[in-house]
């Protein structure tokens, strides 16, 4: 058979890119300047890679938006290239980056626990990548939040559909939900986990409620970048 990643790649030739760009442009027109002069009007989840640079360039330089960037650190040593890339995206486009640096003690315990029990050593950080930007978008009142590619859809995985909304990215199979009971124990208590980290455990009910209260949230759908 043919893998899902190859099928999805072939389907790209059927995409009306002009129509998709107009759809994206309409979202930008809707939210541009929504928080007043100098206020952030959109947000981007960034790592410093190819998706991050393209999205920020598109929003800032082409669409003349004022994005705020959210990033999650993993407490691992970064390569010089990685350090440069993250710095470059802020310096070249003149954007503020707010980073979440997880509790190192809790991360060590949870990485070992989830590796031994589920074979998912980076689950704790992966989950934060898909929850922290949503949480911060609610705080900054920026309902237009852009993520990069759905790795499960693009490269093969359990998700066989294109995720239209940034809120659905968490369903791509990379960081499935676990109950809070799986996070605490072995020396890790709820007090060891910040509110943002604790939200990585439950089913994000509280977080989704906060997002749905944002002004003019577009039916829980985020813009797709062309």
Q: Where are the language model's segments positioned?
A:
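Nucleotide-activated chemistry modules centered on ATP-dependent adenylation/adenylyltransferase
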Residues: 2-43, 58-226
């Amino acid at each position: 058979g043919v893998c899902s990643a190859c099928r999805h790649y072939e389907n790209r030739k059927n995409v009306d890119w002009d129509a998709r760009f107009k759809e994206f442009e309409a979202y930008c027109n809707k939210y541009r300047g929504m928080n007043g002069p100098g206020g952030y009007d959109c947000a981007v989840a960034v790592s410093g890679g190819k998706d991050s640079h393209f999205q920020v360039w598109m929003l800032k330089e082409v669409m003349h938006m004022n994005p705020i960037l959210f990033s999650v650190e993993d407490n691992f040593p970064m390569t010089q290239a990685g350090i440069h890339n993250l710095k470059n995206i802020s310096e070249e486009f003149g954007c503020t980056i707010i980073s979440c640096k997880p509790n190192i003690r809790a991360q060590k315990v949870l990485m070992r626990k989830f590796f031994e029990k589920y074979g998912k050593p980076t689950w704790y950080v992966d989950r934060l990548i898909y929850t922290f930007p949503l949480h911060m978008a609610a705080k900054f009142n920026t309902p237009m939040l852009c993520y990069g590619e759905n790795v499960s859809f693009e490269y093969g995985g359990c998700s066989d559909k294109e995720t239209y909304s940034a809120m659905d990215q968490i369903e791509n199979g990379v960081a499935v939900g676990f109950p809070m009971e799986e996070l605490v124990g072995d020396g890790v208590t709820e007090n060891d986990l910040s509110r943002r980290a604790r939200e990585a455990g439950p089913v994000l009910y509280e977080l989704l409620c906060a997002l749905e209260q944002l002004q003019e949230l577009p039916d829980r759908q985020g813009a797709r970048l062309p």
